[in-house]
């Protein structure tokens, strides 16, 4: 992460362009490292969720390892075609995240989120960029609950949520780390 990086930029590249490329390369390198170090715990969760037939939890577990393609396949195999389409776009466009957040807000305002499986809401909330918590309505106000997004995750996977889904990919790695520290 802190090793010198040969950016292979032309000599006349501006300092701003140099800094932009350097930040992107460092974030990509950090992301790759994080994917590798969380792979074993992700696979342990995957095996447990498959054994218990918890398909939506399986999708979430795969996303916590940034295994987006496998998560989309798992959603598709579970019969969640629409969810698979959204999962395939995980961590991407801010417009997609905003659309998913709008849907969550609508469900919450109408109180129907109380009838949606919490594992499913957790996946939708993550896709919307919520990496700390998500609110769920209750039939009565006292029944309202909060879903802790990083519940059951070690610090590396929790940090990964911020890197991959909580901050725009274009933002510097430092923004993801600050977001994680603030949580």
Language-model features: locations:
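Long all-alpha helical scaffold domains
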Residues: 19-20, 24, 28-183
């Amino acid at each position: 992460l802190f090793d010198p990086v040969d950016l292979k930029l032309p000599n006349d590249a501006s300092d701003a362009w140099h800094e932009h490329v350097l930040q992107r390369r460092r974030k990509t390198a950090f992301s790759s490292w994080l994917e590798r170090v969380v792979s074993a715990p992700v696979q342990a969760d995957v095996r447990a969720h498959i054994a218990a037939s918890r398909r939506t939890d399986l999708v979430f577990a795969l996303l916590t390892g940034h295994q987006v393609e496998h998560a989309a396949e798992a959603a598709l195999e579970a019969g969640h075609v629409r969810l698979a389409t959204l999962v395939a776009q995980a961590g991407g466009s801010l417009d997609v995240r905003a659309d998913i957040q709008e849907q969550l807000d609508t469900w919450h305002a109408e109180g129907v989120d109380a009838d949606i499986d919490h594992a499913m809401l957790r996946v939708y909330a993550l896709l919307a960029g919520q990496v700390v918590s998500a609110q769920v309505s209750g039939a009565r106000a006292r029944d309202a609950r909060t879903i802790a997004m990083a519940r059951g995750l070690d610090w590396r996977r929790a940090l990964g949520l911020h890197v991959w889904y909580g901050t725009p990919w274009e933002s510097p790695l430092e923004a993801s780390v600050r977001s994680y520290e603030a949580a």
